[in-house]
Amino acid sequence: MAFLFKKKVRGIYSLYMGENKKIDGVSTRVKSKYLGPLYRFKEYFADELFKIEHIKHYEYGLSSALRQIMDQFLFQKIFQNKIKKQTEDNYIGKLILLMVMNRLADPCAKYSLQRWFNGTDLANTFDMPAEELEAHKVYRAMDKLDEYAEEIETEICKTILIQENISLNMIYLDFTNQETYSRNHDSELLKNGHNKRGHDELLQVNLSLTCDSNTGIPFFHKSYPGNYNDKQFIKLYTEELRTKLDALGYTGKNTLIIDRGINGDKDFELLRQNRFDYIGGLIQKEFPKYFEIPKSKLRNTHIHKRETKEDVQIKYASANEKIYGKEHLILTLYNVESYGDKVEALGISLKGYKEACEKQLQEFKKEIEEKTFQSHWNNIDKMKNKLKEINKELYPLLRFKIKSYRFNLTWEISENKKEYNKYVDNFGKYVLFTSRLDLKPKEVIELFYGKKKIEKNFHYLKSNGYTNRYLRMGPMLHSKDERIRSHNYTCVLALQIYQIINHRLKKKELDMSVQDVLDELKAITYYHIKIPGQDEPIKHVNQLTQKQKEILKALEVEL
């Protein structure tokens, strides 16, 4: 429970708010907040013996800052104006705003939004009754958001581009998926597919995302069936993405930076038809000659600088050649750091494969001894084929010397050094290509390694409560397609604000993570202290630290 107490420091009494919890059956103070010098509160008390009816404290700093930032980009007005044409609900814009804000401030289930709202100072200042956050009203708002999502997305993207001075000439496009525990097999979105976190047994929905190449702020998104691969989706989405960019005024060409999952002559022809240039990756199976270039012939060097890790040295060679029916700039890269990581991972995989083969051979040996001529495994070629089935990719990297004499099976497994060296020679190699012949090789490399920006967006969305306390997409329990799309969009809207905060921190050279900033703002609390004989409670915000003041200035908000 919360209570007030006074404390003497250097001869001066100050007022504090304390909070106790029972620990091992003993009431122990676990939190205290400085409210100010005691003399400031003298008029509210008859004497130094405080008589208080109750104390309420509300989260204030984070919710207030988020509200101001979202107002700067006209979120609430856009929600209300786009949806209100078809509904008489005067609170619909505010309700959607709160859903987005919650994804950043304290992600919770939709039926818990009212509890979260009542714990913030929004309950005292936001012109909306808390009853509007009842679950059935929230779900109705989600349905409306889905109905008008495309119009809303266009308007919000326009506002962000203008206010943050961002260009979409260069765009990252990537895809992820989110599993769900829903069992709606009639859904058009929820399907079984290759899950990036290994939960292939669960239904999932796919999500595409685009972001600019400089700030990493996301712009366009799309939820689509969980069993679609990248090549299937790009065929459906290319024209739609072109339409979205045209609506923002990009009537010329844009450059897409894409993953190697998109490949093939028809895919890139489709991109060109829709006024897209591209930077992508070639796959070894289709273009082996570029991967076979010896490392000794990669004579150019580029140093890629990173924010949190050591710089990376990249060796490369480049050439202009015709592929996919058009001349492209092609670069073969070698990343020393990536090579070491992959060799280490291969060693672990080979060890596991060798152990699996040993176990299988032991089973062959046992059966041959027991069944003699009746055994199915009297043929060594059959045994080798079975070992190959365990892992076809790693099988050539080992030598198997297997002998069977008088129903006694013996074997020896060793490394095939020639095949091993050939296999690892491609580790750390990437082959990039681009239709932008005006770009220099080093510019292409920087743009390729800049894809970390969009990968971080997915990392933020799909993190759990241990790796990221804010902005979580899952667990997703919705089963109706319109609510799945709406939930995903509220997460993307929250991600836009998250990355805008990150962008502003970098502009002001404030060396803090967004998570740390949100934590600092969340610590700013509004106290309401009710005193007998006073109609209105005493309202007090805890004193801001210097760090909190710097954060608010960087984010361009005031409390």
For every predicted segment, state its role:
Residues 203-208, 427-431, 458:
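Short glycine-rich loop/turn motifs
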